[in-house]
């Protein structure tokens, strides 16, 4: 397992090669096996390939265009270019998995304290599911990219998905072999208390 963790990379270039339904099913099943707070399993995974992927990418493009004019995310303008680049990656990848929080509070309202705690727990649970999926993709010889730039089209994508979008995952055969990214030094990341 440690070797898979060490070898996982964020892939931003994909080959024009199909990914089998069996491979995607295995990745999705790994996500479903993730631990979750109070075993709530807040996730719903929506796989988009082919025409559905093209349609949802068009939805994201419309959301990014709207964000430029009428921002949903305050002060988002400096990051729009990154979201547009991510959209091109999504168009290139053969499969996109969208992760929806089935028990989320709406992004449009201020959460109560209970809802805020629940959202923190749900975010941790969904993060564990996504990590399981990225590691399984790596183990299967596939590349993946954990995508959060979908928030620039949060309203549009959540409507298309019929649920509160949390993140997305691009999946495909890597057309690049990036080096490991720098990590914090152990002494800056780990504190021992005994």
Write out the residue ranges for each language-model feature.
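Short acidic N-proximal helix/loop "leader" segments that mark the beginning
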Residues: 1-18, 22-26
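C-terminal helix-cap and adjacent tail motif
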Residues: 3-11, 165-194
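Small-aliphatic-rich amphipathic alpha-helix that forms the alpha element of a beta-alpha
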Residues: 27, 31, 97, 103, ...
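Glycine-rich phosphate/pyrophosphate-binding beta-alpha loops
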Residues: 35-39, 170
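Solvent-exposed alpha-helices and their adjacent loops that cap or buttress functional pockets
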Residues: 37-38, 89-91, 139, 160-162, ...
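Glycine/small-residue-rich phosphate/adenosyl-binding loop
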Residues: 46-126
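Short, conserved aromatic-histidine micro-motifs
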Residues: 63-64, 98, 154-172
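Generic beta-strand structural signal
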Residues: 93-95, 140, 165-167
């Amino acid at each position: 397992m440690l070797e898979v963790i060490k070898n996982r990379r964020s892939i931003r270039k994909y080959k024009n090669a199909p990914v089998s339904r069996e491979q995607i099913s295995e990745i999705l099943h790994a996500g479903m096996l993730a631990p979750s707070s109070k075993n709530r399993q807040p996730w719903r995974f929506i796989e988009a390939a082919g025409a559905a992927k093209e349609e949802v990418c068009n939805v994201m493009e419309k959301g990014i265009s709207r964000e430029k004019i009428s921002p949903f995310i305050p002060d988002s303008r400096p990051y729009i270019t990154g979201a547009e680049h991510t959209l091109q990656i999504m168009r290139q990848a053969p499969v996109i998995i969208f992760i929806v929080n089935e028990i989320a509070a709406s992004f449009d309202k201020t959460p109560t304290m209970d809802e805020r705690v629940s959202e923190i727990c749900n975010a941790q649970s969904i993060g564990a599911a996504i990590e399981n999926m990225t590691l399984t993709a790596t183990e299967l010889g596939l590349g993946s990219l954990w995508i959060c730039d979908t928030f620039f089209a949060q309203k549009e994508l959540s409507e298309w998905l019929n649920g509160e979008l949390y993140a997305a995952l691009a999946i495909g055969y890597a057309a690049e072999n990036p080096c490991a990214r720098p990590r914090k030094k152990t002494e800056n990341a780990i504190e021992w208390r005994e």
